[in-house]
């Protein structure tokens, strides 16, 4: 651990200590050593969403007041958070992804701005609202991943374009919503488009000039998924051709899948990114349009040089027309940063039948001399792995209402699916929990090294799910399912909870009327901040969950809470501007229950709390 002094005299521990800095993003590493900055999309490379700042505490939080606001001039969903380095704050908006640089020492004056010229038609290809999830900083540059696929490097001082590279092509349905992640001499970015039959990937570009360093696809041959002979060496059962036995025809109506035990599974198989896509597929060689979107928040451990991320759902949502386990969709992977080669990869929802997108963030934490990787998956289970080997330590339901599977085998990582929850073409499966947007969607959880707990926003939403026939056409939606959504058995649509990451047992739980769609922030004063769809910005006690403070902002808050220090004062903030999957139907005036992939019906009451479309704004508070 490195000990630093903040401007407030706090001794701050920077977890996952780094070796000597001799690479492009040395300025980013230096900035992250000072807790007054927020130089990474989640604060630090470990993705914890934690700050050592503690000026705002339980004793004085009642005095927290609005310090300043900034209207972005753009409507609809504002996710992610700004980047703060020294006296400069950098903000990106929803489409068209305008960037503003504000001087915190000069009344938040706009020092420079950048306005991308994007084709408005790109908006029609964005799956779940016009969102983007933040900016990257390093090597004297601000990195912008535009919705239209352009990755752009801007000079942090004046906003002038340094380089740009085309990462995805909206003409075939491939877009971007992720924040670029700057790590050492590379900029990592991903790909969205599983609802358009896009074969997605994670890519690393050289920070200096934008040249491609490596690209790893979510599906396909080992040479293209960057799996080698040593991938999953510590857990060969993760490399299995099949982990289920078909029951009553498997993919046929009335069929289901029985989990194989560890001694029944043959591990150590190769070329699984093609061989687990069995015939007949909806389209020849289905893996070539296999989805596996990558757009979350990706941690990095300099001690092992591993970067971690989740890949999303397979295309198409109709499971009957893509038999097989469909690797490596629905998978958390650890890759070598320099080469992209996978050290380990575990598929969480083999042969997905519910769109339980596996893209959610991974969080790294240390305990008793070991490093662990934690992930709250949309499928309703929280997973804890040995971060170096990929061995599964714990996997538990985050809430009792999860009813598609009983449990997860810790030896194989395979869930025990329930036959009653299987979905089939032209059959309307009812009462499945969670809904396709999962027990948690894009909203990242946070970890506190002070309490040793994870803090997670929650969706408590169930669904009906009916797969339907759908033909692939490049650049057109390719979903293949009809959904409706409704509140879970708790009678609410969301919540916020604390978990012990070594067991994934719940410590405390607060109900929320709607899904908590905002990313969480933890601080050294044992306070947790998050936002809600009914416009509240809240602070709760990290140890008990007791509400300490709240303020109602102008639109639903789906951004990530963040904090920074300036001139001896701590500030905490959040972006508001309702949207995302939960809010897109309201923004577009959709009223049929099945619109917006079921969100229109499930979230119809949002119109009682929000004007549409939601106006984007940054809300900043201090004592």
Predicted segments, located by residue:
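Aromatic (tryptophan-biased) beta-strands that constitute blades/sheets of beta-rich domains
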Residues: 25-72, 109-124, 160-169, 211-220, ...
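Short loop/turn segments that connect beta-strands within beta-propeller blades
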Residues: 103-107, 155-158, 206-209, 337-339, ...
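Beta-propeller domains
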Residues: 260-266, 270-382, 386-391, 396-400, ...
């Amino acid at each position: 651990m490195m000990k630093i002094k903040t401007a407030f005299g706090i001794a701050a521990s920077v977890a996952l200590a780094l070796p000597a800095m001799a690479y492009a993003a040395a300025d980013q590493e230096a900035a992250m050593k000072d807790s007054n900055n927020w130089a990474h999309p989640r604060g630090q490379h470990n993705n914890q969403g934690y700050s050592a700042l503690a000026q705002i505490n339980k004793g004085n939080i009642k005095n927290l007041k609005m310090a300043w606001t900034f209207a972005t001039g753009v409507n609809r969903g504002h996710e992610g958070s700004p980047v703060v380095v020294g006296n400069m704050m950098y903000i990106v908006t929803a489409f068209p992804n305008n960037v503003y640089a504000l001087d915190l020492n000069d009344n938040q004056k706009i020092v420079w701005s950048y306005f991308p010229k994007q084709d408005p038609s790109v908006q029609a290809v964005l799956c779940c609202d016009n969102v983007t999830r933040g900016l990257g900083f390093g090597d004297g540059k601000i990195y912008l991943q535009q919705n239209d696929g352009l990755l752009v490097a801007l000079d942090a001082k004046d906003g002038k374009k340094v380089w740009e590279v085309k990462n995805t092509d909206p003409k075939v349905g491939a877009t971007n919503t992720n924040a670029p992640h700057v790590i050492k001499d590379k900029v990592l970015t991903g790909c969205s488009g599983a609802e358009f039959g896009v074969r997605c990937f994670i890519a690393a570009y050289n920070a200096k000039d934008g040249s491609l360093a490596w690209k790893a696809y979510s599906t396909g041959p080992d040479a293209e998924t960057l799996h080698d002979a040593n991938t999953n060496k510590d857990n060969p059962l993760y490399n299995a051709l099949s982990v289920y036995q078909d029951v009553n025809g498997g993919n046929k109506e009335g069929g289901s899948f029985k989990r194989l035990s560890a001694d029944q599974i043959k591990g150590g198989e190769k070329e699984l990114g093609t061989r687990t896509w069995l015939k007949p597929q909806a389209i020849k060689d289905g893996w070539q349009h296999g989805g596996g979107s990558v757009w979350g928040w990706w941690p990095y451990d300099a001690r092992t040089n591993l970067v971690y991320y989740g890949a999303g759902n397979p295309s198409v949502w109709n499971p009957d027309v893509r038999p097989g386990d469909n690797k490596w969709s629905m998978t958390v992977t650890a890759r070598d940063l320099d080469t992209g080669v996978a050290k380990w990869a575990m598929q969480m929802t083999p042969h997905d039948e519910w769109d339980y997108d596996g893209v959610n963030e991974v969080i790294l934490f240390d305990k008793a001399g070991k490093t662990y990787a934690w992930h709250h998956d949309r499928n309703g289970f929280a997973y804890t792995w040995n971060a170096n080997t990929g061995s599964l330590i714990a996997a538990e339901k985050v809430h009792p209402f999860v009813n598609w599977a009983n449990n997860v085998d810790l030896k194989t990582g395979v869930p025990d699916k329930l036959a009653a929850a299987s979905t089939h073409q032209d059959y309307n499966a009812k009462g499945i929990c969670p809904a396709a947007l999962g027990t948690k969607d894009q909203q990242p959880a946070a970890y506190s090294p002070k309490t040793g707990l994870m803090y997670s926003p929650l969706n408590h939403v169930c669904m009906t799910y009916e797969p339907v026939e759908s033909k692939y056409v490049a650049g057109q939606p390719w979903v293949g399912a009809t959904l409706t959504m409704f509140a879970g058995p708790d009678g609410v649509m969301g919540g916020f909870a604390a978990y012990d990451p070594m067991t994934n047992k719940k410590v405390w739980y607060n109900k929320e009327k709607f899904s908590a769609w905002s990313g969480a922030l933890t601080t050294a004063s044992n306070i947790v901040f998050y936002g809600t769809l009914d416009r509240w910005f809240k602070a709760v006690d990290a140890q008990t969950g007791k509400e300490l403070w709240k303020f109602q902002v102008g639109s639903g808050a789906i951004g990530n809470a963040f904090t920074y220090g300036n001139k001896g004062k701590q500030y905490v903030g959040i972006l508001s501007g309702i949207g995302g999957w939960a809010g897109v139907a309201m923004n577009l005036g959709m009223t049929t229950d099945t619109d917006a992939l079921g969100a229109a019906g499930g979230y119809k009451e949002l119109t009682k709390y929000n004007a549409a479309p939601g106006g984007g704004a940054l809300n900043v508070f201090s004592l």
